[in-house]
């Protein structure tokens, strides 16, 4: 049975409304270049950002793991279909994109003590090395997805961006901007960053800067498994608006006892997540990541577009 058709949980008051395709929204006063302000939230959701003004002080931490048998089978299938290099990262990102299609409240963010939604723009940031060597430079790529993207769509978008940054683009826009800031003396740089924070607080930061900023988006994901180490709890940045940091580790084997008393060896991957609790209620976050685990148990559902896409409140 398709996991997405199983929606036994009752929707919360400020959860979402069903609509497909996405309703067209006119830009209103108070909206930002990267999202629209949510004006129909419950009072507590509007007050909590003033009680917990910083992202670092409003972070919640949790960890979990998933058994990788079905994911490995799925990866082999996709590679046999010609998707070279398709791996766990693609499955995790595709699963997260699918979460947003069913739990759009997870795609919210805080800025200037107000709650906004990215709407149908799912922005995921990823750090990559230009070459797999110790000396190779790192850069950050920003990927845009939509709630209807399949695993194949996710693969194509990621592959295109990585190839562009590794081959045809020696300096990304972010790298070029960082080099410019590097020439500014320390005291002036501190004031420049303060001014950027001020613009961002009031939603006046230009869209061009938001687009190259690694501190703005829906989620930041990092693979510690590629380094051969366990996942870490990575802090959220007080600058920008990224509300979720997702870290996953390397595969490992675990012995488990079956019902008949025999021992079976299975492979798992651990992951750790840090979230800004102010974006939505705990029910939305918990049910969203429960959905993610269901997709990891049956990743083949990611080959098809979601039957229904849910959109956030106004």
Regions found by a protein language model. Give the residues of each.
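C-terminal catalytic/motor cores of large multi-domain enzyme assemblies
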Residues: 2-314
């Amino acid at each position: 049975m398709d996991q997405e058709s199983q929606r036994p949980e009752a929707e919360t008051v400020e959860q979402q409304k069903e609509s497909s395709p996405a309703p067209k929204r006119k830009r209103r006063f108070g909206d930002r270049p990267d999202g629209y302000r949510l004006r129909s939230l419950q009072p507590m959701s509007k007050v909590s950002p003033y009680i917990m003004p910083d992202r670092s002080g409003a972070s919640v931490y949790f960890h979990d793991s998933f058994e990788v048998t079905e994911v490995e089978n799925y990866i082999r299938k996709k590679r046999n279909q010609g998707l070279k290099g398709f791996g766990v990262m693609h499955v995790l990102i595709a699963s997260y994109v699918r979460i947003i299609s069913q739990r759009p409240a997870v795609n919210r963010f805080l800025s200037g003590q107000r709650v906004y939604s990215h709407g149908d723009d799912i922005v995921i940031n990823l750090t990559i090395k230009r070459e797999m060597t110790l000396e190779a430079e790192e850069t950050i790529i920003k990927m845009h997805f939509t709630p209807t993207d399949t695993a194949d769509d996710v693969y194509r978008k990621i592959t295109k961006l990585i190839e562009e940054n590794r081959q045809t683009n020696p300096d990304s826009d972010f790298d070029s901007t960082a080099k410019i800031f590097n020439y500014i003396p320390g005291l002036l740089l501190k004031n420049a960053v303060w001014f950027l924070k001020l613009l961002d607080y009031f939603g006046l930061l230009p869209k061009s800067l938001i687009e190259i900023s690694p501190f703005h988006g829906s989620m930041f994901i990092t693979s510690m498994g590629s380094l051969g180490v366990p996942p870490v709890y990575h802090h959220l940045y007080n600058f920008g608006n990224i509300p979720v940091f997702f870290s996953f580790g390397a595969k490992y084997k675990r012995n488990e006892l079956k019902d008949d008393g025999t021992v079976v060896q299975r492979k798992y991957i651990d992951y750790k997540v840090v979230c800004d609790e102010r974006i939505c209620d705990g029910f939305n976050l918990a049910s969203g990541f429960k959905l993610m685990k269901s997709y990891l148990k049956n990743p083949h559902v990611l080959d098809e577009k979601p039957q229904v896409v849910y959109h956030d409140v106004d």
